[in-house]
């Protein structure tokens, strides 16, 4: 399995046979943030991301998602096909729970990218989405991340009403230990549904 230069499989990833880099990526976790993280909504566009810097950009994709779509596809284009090349070379498969950390240099306003596998689309459910989000929060804490940008972990692709499960995801992200700001990149309709759910269910 060829390893992409500068990238690594985070320890604890569930992808069988993945190379594990233990210790090298971890930093001392910062002190727990006592309040809820600030929440910001942005459009899933590169120019908007450029104007909304954060410590970490979280991208996610299904193992059978070809080609990469949405924000992951846009970022892949900005990175000259780096994410696609991982898949072609077998470095990253998108298996459920897989996490790849990648330094972006100056190509994005986010110095580090965390690419997360969601497994097969047909097997994906809202409880899996929330589980992946919890893993991301834990990884961010271990890396000392204060601000992050993420999508909705493909909740908008599920049959479950987004206005019901979306607020649970937002609450989980905002409650993450050490996080001071969470930026969610989502289209207008998904943003409206989640916001309506937050208002109705009080999350």
Which residues does each PLM region occupy?
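Intrinsic disorder/low-complexity signal
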Residues: 10-11, 27
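Glycine-/small-residue-enriched capping loops at alpha/beta junctions
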Residues: 2-3, 17-203
């Amino acid at each position: 399995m060829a390893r992409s230069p500068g990238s690594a499989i985070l320890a604890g990833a569930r992808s069988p046979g993945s190379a594990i880099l233990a210790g090298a990526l971890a930093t001392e976790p910062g002190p727990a943030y006592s309040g809820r993280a600030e929440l910001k909504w942005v459009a899933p566009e590169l120019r908007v991301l450029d104007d909304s810097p954060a410590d970490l950009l979280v991208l996610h994709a299904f193992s059978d998602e070809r080609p990469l779509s949405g924000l992951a596809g846009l970022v892949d284009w900005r990175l000259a096909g780096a994410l696609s090349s991982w898949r072609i070379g077998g470095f990253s498969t998108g298996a459920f729970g897989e996490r790849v950390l990648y330094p972006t240099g100056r190509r994005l306003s986010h110095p580090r990218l965390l690419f997360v596998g969601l497994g097969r689309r047909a097997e994906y459910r809202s409880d899996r989405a929330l589980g992946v989000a919890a893993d991301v929060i834990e990884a961010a804490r271990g890396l000392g991340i204060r601000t992050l940008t993420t999508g909705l972990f493909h909740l908008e692709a599920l049959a479950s009403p987004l206005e019901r499960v979306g607020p649970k995801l937002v609450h989980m992200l905002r409650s993450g230990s050490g996080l001071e700001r969470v930026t969610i990149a989502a289209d207008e309709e998904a943003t409206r549904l989640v916001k309506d759910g937050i208002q109705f269910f009080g999350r």
